[in-house]
C-alpha cells in the first residue's frame, strides 16, 4: 500500500535530486506483498509470506543517465543514496537518446477507476486460504490407485506503485490477485510418470473458482496415460488456450523497439505488411474495467490507448519506447502492450477438434526455442493425435518446427475460449500444414 506519507517522501526525493545536480529524473515508489500455501497430499509443505517496498530513481545528469534502487526509505539515507547516484552517473558515457518522454504524451488523469483492487484482500483468514488448497487436493486423493502424489496451492498478493517525472507526470496504480492450483502425478506404463495440473486465477477473491481444480488436474493427467510418438509428417495443429501464448510470444517479442533498433527482429521493416492470415486480429485493450493488464499509462507514464497490433494478418504497430525511438529516429508508440485480445471465433475446443480429419492437439510445450532474428522455431510438444474429428491417442516426445511468419499465415481458425483471467486473452488456435517429427 502506498500512503500519503510515502508520496510526500517520493516528491521530496525528486526535489532533492533536482537541487543537487540532476537536470531531470523519474522515480517509482513501489510496495508489494504476497502469500502462498503449498500442500503435498493435503498436508502443509511450504508456507511463504513476503513483502517489499522500495524506491527506484532514474537520473539524467549532464547528458548522462543512470538508474538506481533502494529499499532503505529513511530520508537521511535517501539523501546519500541520491547524491551517490548523481556522482556515479557523471562517470558514465553520454547518451543523447536518454531523455524523458514529451510531457504532452503523459496520462493526465480524469478517467474512471479501473477496479483492479479487491479490498477484501486485507480481511482474508489464513485458515480459509489453506482450506481452499486442501480442498483441491482432497478432490483427487483416493480417486485412482495410480496416483503417486498430489500438490495443491493457494496464493494471493497485492502490488502498488507511485510514479513521478520531473517534467510533469504523476500516477498511481494498485492491483490484487488470487490463485489456486493443483498438480497430479500418476504411475503410467513402465517407468512413465505422467503429470498434469490445473489452476484458476482472478483479481477479486469472490471471482476465483475454488472448486473443481483438483478434479480437472486428475482428469487431464489420466488422459495422458499411454503416451507415445505419432508418425512424422504434416498435420493440422490445434493449440489449446492454456498454451496458445507460447506461439504468440515470439511474434510480440519481435515488435519491441529494442529488437528493432538492434536489427534482431524478424519483423523489422514489416509495418503495414501482411505477416499472418486474415484470422490474425490482435488488439491491445488497456482500458477494460476490472481486467488483468488494464492500465491508463505505461512504465514511462505515457497514456495508453486502444490500438490494433495485427489487422487481418497485417502488422499495424510496433512497441517503441522513448529511448529506442530516439536511437532509431522514429516516432514513439508505447513501451509495451497492456491487455491483448485475439478476436475469437464461434467454436470451442471440442468443436475445433471435430472439424479436423488428421491433426495434433497440442496441450503442452516442452522446451525448444524461436530464433528472434529469423523467426525459425522448434518446440517439443505433447498432446493428442486427432483422426476423423476425435482424440484417438495421447502423444509426447514430438517436435514441431517451422517459421513464425509461415505458421501465422497458416492460421485457419480461432476458438471462442480465451482465459479471461490472463493478460493475453488468446483462444484455441488452428494451423494447417504444420511439420511434426515423431516416429
Predicted features by range, described:
Residues 268-439:
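Dual-mode signal for accessory low-complexity, basic/Gly-rich regions
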Residues 1-295, 302, 311-314, 338, ...:
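Active-site bordering "gate/hinge" segments
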Amino acid at each position: 500500500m502506498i500512503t500519503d506519507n510515502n508520496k510526500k517522501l517520493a516528491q521530496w526525493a525528486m526535489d532533492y535530486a533536482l537541487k543537487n545536480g540532476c537536470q531531470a529524473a523519474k522515480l517509482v515508489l513501489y510496495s508489494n506483498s504476497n502469500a502462498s500455501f503449498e500442500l503435498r497430499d493435503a498436508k502443509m509443505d511450504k508456507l511463504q509470506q513476503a513483502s517489499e517496498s522500495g524506491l527506484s530513481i532514474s537520473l539524467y545528469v549532464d547528458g548522462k543517465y543512470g538508474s538506481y534502487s533502494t529499499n532503505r526509505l529513511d530520508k537521511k539515507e535517501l539523501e546519500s543514496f541520491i547524491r551517490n547516484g548523481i556522482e556515479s552517473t557523471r562517470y558514465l558515457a553520454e547518451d543523447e537518446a536518454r531523455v524523458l518522454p514529451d510531457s504532452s504524451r503523459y496520462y493526465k488523469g480524469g478517467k474512471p477507476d479501473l477496479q483492479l483492487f479487491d479490498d477484501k484482500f486485507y480481511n482474508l483468514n489464513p485458515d480459509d486460504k489453506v482450506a481452499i488448497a486442501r480442498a483441491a487436493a482432497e478432490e483427487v486423493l483416493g480417486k485412482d490407485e495410480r496416483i503417486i502424489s498430489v500438490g495443491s496451492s493457494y496464493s494471493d498478493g497485492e502490488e502498488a506503485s507511485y510514479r513521478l517525472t520531473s517534467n510533469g507526470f504523476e500516477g498511481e496504480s494498485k492491483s490484487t490477485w488470487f490463485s489456486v492450483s493443483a498438480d497430479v502425478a500418476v504411475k503410467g506404463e513402465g517407468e512413465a510418470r505422467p503429470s498434469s495440473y490445473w489452476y484458476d486465477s482472478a483479481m477479486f477473491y469472490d471471482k476465483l473458482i475454488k472448486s473443481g481444480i483438483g478434479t480437472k488436474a486428475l482428469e487431464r493427467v489420466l488422459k495422458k496415460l499411454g503416451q507415445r510418438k505419432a508418425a512424422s509428417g504434416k498435420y493440422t495443429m490445434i493449440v489449446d488456450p492454456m498454451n496458445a501464448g507460447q506461439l504468440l510470444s515470439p511474434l510480440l517479442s519481435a515488435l519491441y523497439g529494442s529488437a528493432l533498433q538492434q536489427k534482431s527482429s524478424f519483423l523489422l521493416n514489416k509495418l503495414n505488411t501482411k505477416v499472418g492470415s486474415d484470422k490474425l486480429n490482435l488488439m491491445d485493450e488497456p482500458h477494460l474495467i476490472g481486467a488483468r493488464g488494464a492500465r491508463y499509462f505505461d512504465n514511462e507514464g505515457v497514456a495508453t490507448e486502444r490500438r490494433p497490433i495485427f489487422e487481418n494478418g497485417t502488422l499495424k504497430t510496433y512497441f517503441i519506447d522513448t529511448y529506442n525511438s530516439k536511437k532509431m529516429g522514429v516516432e514513439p508508440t508505447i513501451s509495451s502492450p497492456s491487455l491483448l485480445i485475439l478476436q475469437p471465433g464461434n467454436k470451442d475446443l471440442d468443436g475445433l477438434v471435430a472439424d479436423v480429419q488428421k491433426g495434433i492437439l497440442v496441450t503442452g510445450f516442452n522446451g525448444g526455442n524461436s530464433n528472434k532474428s529469423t523467426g525459425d522455431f522448434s518446440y517439443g510438444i505433447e498432446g493428442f493425435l486427432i483422426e476423423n474429428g476425435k482424440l484417438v491417442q495421447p502423444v509426447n516426445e514430438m517436435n514441431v518446427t517451422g517459421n513464425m511468419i509461415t505458421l501465422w499465415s497458416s492460421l485457419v481458425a480461432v476458438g471462442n475460449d480465451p482465459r479471461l483471467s490472463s493478460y493475453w486473452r488468446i483462444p484455441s488456435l488452428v494451423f494447417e500444414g504444420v511439420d511434426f517429427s515423431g516416429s
